[in-house]
């Protein structure tokens, strides 16, 4: 089987997904013509030499595979999906908003098929008349593993990971946690929330604003992680993940990965979270309503992309979830580990290939 694969190879979420899909293509013996979006950089990942050589050969020989009859899988945003390498293009993408615009629907329909991560995103486009929309689900990154180390056994260690954004409720999560646990030495909150699209000065301003100009002895802001190994160590170090309180996700990889590593995640029962988070493997919080998605930076009102609302939650319901999660500290989330065994990238690739065939 031959496939053209157009995707970014970098340390961001799309790059992580791309590397995992490539690994499964390699295992299946698929002949791939790899067209990187942007400068390829796989230094964030521990890639075995044979697989690494295969990736490089797939880039070097991409024009040998290129043919109008070879299907192209493009892993990218709707914004920027209007060009194609071959006649049949299958866009693999993510969507966090709730009201597909005319332009987004036009671009989705332009593809042979548009594969949206998660049923929530797919339903938004199906209901808007995009009959070529198909859902798929991500898998658990096999490079993540349980280290078995003891990190801070004397403290209840909470963690939040993901770009600082309004739609992720980053500031609200931190402020809610501080209201309950701020300066209590029994508890620690570690935040890996650097947004690489902001300058260092902008990030400092966001953090200062979030903390209300106060100093807290039990909250840490960590630098942006450059490697998967650092992410793995972070997820192993925490007891309770709060990244799942995001109000709109294409999948929610940090909370999903933490869950699959046997940690306890407090998860908003909405959007793509509903595809993997259950009452058995997560501490679920029900939404209290919806609010506009617009932040004036990544989501701008009346723009051609990313319009609509995100889900919100009440502080009271999250306080209650914190307490439920505390009770589980020290116990392994066995159902979460089972989730990681069920959600594999082999299955993800099979779902994508099924859409092609």
Q: PLM features: residue spans?
A:
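A charged, aromatic-enriched C-terminal amphipathic alpha-helix characteristic of glycosyltransferases
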Residues: 309-320, 326-356
